[in-house]
């Protein structure tokens, strides 16, 4: 399995260095490798809207706070730790089930979160993630002890969703899903 943890933190630094008017298109470009995550949306999603809808950092208003958060994520070696967490999860899952079908390629987007969003920062502790579409994982993070202490576990958790609903796994039927599957999912 090829794991591609995107250089999204470096891209975020570049975004914060350009005029505000140029930022939306750069956010779209940063997120463009995730277009394949949504084949059911004709023409693909507007990646700026996806960024905003998944607690991504604001385009303007708190640049210095964003730079500080970005530096903390980089210092925490998030890219390397996400990849390590996925490798560790792969070893554990394939040891438990040698016939398990893994995605051929996994694209992971790590996005700096929005420190101005009260729900994101307080109720969900700076963590929003999604791994339910095979081949893609999205992690939106704000550096704090809850997030930084659990990077590998967060990545492994989302990878589990990826494998569970991938080829050979559970077929998700929202009209017939049982409560037990909802809980495990």
Each predicted region: which residue ranges?
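Short acidic/polar capping segments at secondary-structure boundaries
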Residues: 112-116, 142-146, 161, 168-170
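Auxiliary, metal-adjacent structural segments of Zn-dependent hydrolase domains
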Residues: 69-134
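Active-site recognition of the HExxH zinc-binding catalytic motif
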Residues: 153-166
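Alpha-helical scaffolds flanking conserved acidic
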Residues: 104-106, 150-152, 179-183
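N-terminal low-structure segments adjacent to metalloprotease catalytic domains
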Residues: 1-67, 71-77
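Post-HEXXH active-site segment of zinc metalloproteases
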Residues: 165-184
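Flexible, glycine- and charge-enriched loops at secondary-structure boundaries
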Residues: 75, 79, 149, 178
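Short pre-active-site segment immediately N-terminal to the catalytic Zn-binding motif
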Residues: 139-155
